[in-house]
Structures are given as C-alpha cells and as structure tokens.
Amino acid sequence: RDVERSRGLGDVYKRQDSHIHTMFSSDSEENPVNVVNNAISLGFKHICFTDHNDFDAPLEDGKVMFDLDFPEYIKYFQNLKESYKNKINIHIGVEQGLMRSVADRVNAYDSAKQLDFIIGSSHLVYGEDPYYPEFWEKRSAKDTVLTYYESILDNLGCCHNFDVYGHLDYIARYIPANSYTYNWHDFNDLICIILKTIIEQGKGIEVNTAGLKYGMPEPNPCLDIVKMYHDLGGEIITVGSDAHEVKFFAYRFDVVADMLKNAGFNYYTIFNERKPEFIRL
C-alpha cells in the first residue's frame, strides 16, 4: 500500500473530516462557509461535505425529507471550492441512503461523476426509521438489531455506487433504554460476513465519531469491529464527525489516531474523484 507521508501523529487531526452536513441536509441549518472557515482556523488541509440523499425517506409533517437538490448542491460547492482553493481543498460528497427498493436510483446516481466521495449508509431498515420509538415496537430489541444487520447485507447485494459504508453499527444509537444492552458479539458471524463482503467489493468503512456525542463509549463502529475489518484484510477506512453543526466539526478526532493504531492501521483514507488516497498516521 502506497501511503502518503505526513509530519506526525497529530496530523491525523489536520487532514480531513470526511462526513459533514450543512443546510443542504434536511436535519441541518449550518452554513457551509462557517464550517470551511472553522476548518481553516484549526489547520485542516482538506474537508469533505457529505449532505444527505435518502430516496423514499418517510415524510415528516407532510414534508419530503433528505431529498437533495443535486444540481444546486454541486453548483454551490463547486463555487465554494473555487473561492477557497488557495486556503483549503474542498471535496464534494454525498451520504446516500441504501435500500434494495431504491437500488436502481442509487446505482445511477451522479452518472456525470461530479462527486469526490459517496458514503453508503443504512438510515432506514426496509423502509422504516429506527430513530422513531414505534420502529422498536414490532419485535424484541435484539431481533430488531439483527434485522438491521441483515438489511445491510441485503443492501450490499444490490447497491454498489458508494465508497465506504457509514457508521456500521448506527442502530446502537437508538436502542430503547432498558430493552436490550447492545453487544456486537451477539451478531459476530453476520458482521463478519458484512465486512468480508465490503472488502470483496473493494469498498471501505468509516470511523464516525458522532456516537460519542450521543453518550456512546466509542465511535461507530466500535474498536473491535474496526479491528475485525483490518484483520480480515480491510484497507479503506475514512474518518468523519457526522457534524450537523459547526461546533461538532472534527468532534473527538483526538481519539481516532489511537483507535486506528490499536486496530492495526498505520494510515487512514480520504477520497478525491472517487479514488482513495492513504494518509499515514
């Protein structure tokens, strides 16, 4: 693996946040300019915006959610990229919701190849949203988590137009209190198959630090899953805050370098024009 040499361990915090949301996402009001200026002030060299696009997301109060205005999005960020080209490298990405029912649209997305990066994520489980309490009422919490992981494997069989799978154990953020104490070992075999499939498809995973602000003890996915991914031969691994407000940009990136090293990595990944670049820790 060819790995770009950087100036030291601390540089991992100053390279790129690869998962950021702005006013182009239905659940954020953040102005991208605020994020860019903050990144520059912190010494970041790269930044990648990844606003939501979730086909067939459930309506909220009668409004369509997470339907990205792609032409306007590209136009805006291409202009922003040009404006800041001498200060920071702005990459344009999307966080794409994956489901079998929308696979054709996912696979045809960005046919003109204007994006640098696509995160594929499971926000919905066969069309249902684990964010809402009623999602958890149909079966036991443990069985619901199993269904979530089964849906990821199903998504991998039909959705191919993405670069890394986002926040792999995302479901753990929303398990109702006093229902089931999440333990990834309960799903070890299935997670192993998921990771092997991701690797076989030449894709990667992300370390998403947003879980820490939800009170979780580790980023998503946890260290053990990241280590399993490495031990199975996984190479592509990005780092993202999943920030929806500028104050969470690069949130808790201080824990990431040690986490990746403990998992066996000596680098992490950024994407440019859908191609991975490897940055030494």
What are these regions (language model features)?
Residues 11-103, 109-112, 174-185, 209, ...:
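An N-terminally biased module of ancient metal coordination in phosphate/nucleic-acid-related enzymes
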Residues 60-63, 67-200:
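Extended substrate/RNA-proximal surfaces in nucleic-acid metabolism proteins
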Residues 8, 43, 114, 160-161, ...:
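Short loop/turn motifs at secondary-structure junctions
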Residues 1-13:
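Single conserved hydrophobic/aromatic residue that forms the stacking wall/gate
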Residues 15-17, 46-48, 89-93, 116-119, ...:
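Structural preference for beta-strand elements that scaffold enzyme active sites
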Residues 50, 121, 168, 208, ...:
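Conserved residues at the C-terminal ends of beta-strands
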Residues 11-22, 32, 126, 178-281:
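Charged catalytic cores and adjacent phosphate/nucleic-acid-binding surfaces used
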